[in-house]
């Protein structure tokens, strides 16, 4: 008998809760590319998630703000927040392969997610996963026309994200190397590999970064 698919939106909600459940507490980590290490933190503050990263001993802040319809990214300068131009969503942070859009994971909040059946590709790291496909509601904004997210059928952890460009080609792959269990029983990634593909040959990796998360205190 074929198993019944859960609601794709509910699956994404569980993944999002893993990132934001530590309300008003910072989740800390670092972005690595070769010898470059960029410390960062993220925390839920009311209707936004605040991100901070350290470059040349200076902390920089940007926020993912939730509105009635959709989200926007705010950038802080001289103590004031302004809307980050959408052209900068795809700008790498501090020379890494991780962009503002990537770190904010704004795609997890896009509407119209659906589960796609691809039994041949549904296993990641030996884990049986639901594959959730999410179209970009504004395909002219950011790097991805749509993304695919692999979510563990048993524990709800996210194992892989594929960012697909406007040509339908794989632009970037986020692979979860390891996960950690949080105090509320949910799962969140401990290490994520960011794999940038060659636009002329999407099977070829041209650059790699890592995102390492500290265990919440």
Describe the residue ranges of each PLM region:
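Gly/Pro-enriched, hydrophobic low-complexity segments
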Residues: 125-217
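N-terminal mature ectodomain segment of secretory-pathway/periplasmic proteins
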Residues: 3-78
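Short, surface-exposed linear segments at secondary-structure transitions and domain or protein termini
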Residues: 46-52, 69-74, 91-101, 181-187, ...
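Short, surface-exposed beta-strand/loop "edge" segments at domain boundaries and coil↔beta transitions
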Residues: 35-40, 56-64, 78-85, 139-144, ...
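Intrinsically disordered, low-complexity segments enriched in polar/charged residues with Gly/Pro
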Residues: 28-30, 38, 49-53, 59-62, ...
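Short, exposed beta-strand/loop patches in secreted or surface proteins that constitute
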Residues: 39-45, 63-66, 113-122, 177-180
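Flexible, processing/modification-adjacent segments and terminal tails
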Residues: 3-14, 20-21, 66-145, 166-168
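Intrinsic-disorder/low-complexity loop/linker signature
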Residues: 29, 35, 47, 57, ...
């Amino acid at each position: 008998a074929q198993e019944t698919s859960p609601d794709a939106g509910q699956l994404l909600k569980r993944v999002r809760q893993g990132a934001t459940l530590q309300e008003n507490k910072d989740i800390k980590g670092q972005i690595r590319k070769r010898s470059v290490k960029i410390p960062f933190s993220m925390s839920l503050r009311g209707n936004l998630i605040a991100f901070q990263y350290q470059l040349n001993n200076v902390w920089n802040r940007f926020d993912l703000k939730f509105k009635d319809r959709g989200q926007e990214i705010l950038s802080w300068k001289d103590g004031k927040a302004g809307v980050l131009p959408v052209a900068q969503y795809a700008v790498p942070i501090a020379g890494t392969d991780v962009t503002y859009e990537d770190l904010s994971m704004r795609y997890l909040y896009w509407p119209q997610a659906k589960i796609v059946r691809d039994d041949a590709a549904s296993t990641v790291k030996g884990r049986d996963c639901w594959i959730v496909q999410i179209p970009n509601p504004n395909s002219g904004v950011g790097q991805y026309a749509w993304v695919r997210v692999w979510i563990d059928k048993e524990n709800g952890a996210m194992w892989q994200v594929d960012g697909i460009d406007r040509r339908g080609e794989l632009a970037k792959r986020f692979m979860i190397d390891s996960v950690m269990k949080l105090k509320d029983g949910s799962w969140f990634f401990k290490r994520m590999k960011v794999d940038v593909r060659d636009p002329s040959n999407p099977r070829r990796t041209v650059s790699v970064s890592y995102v390492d998360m500290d265990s919440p205190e």
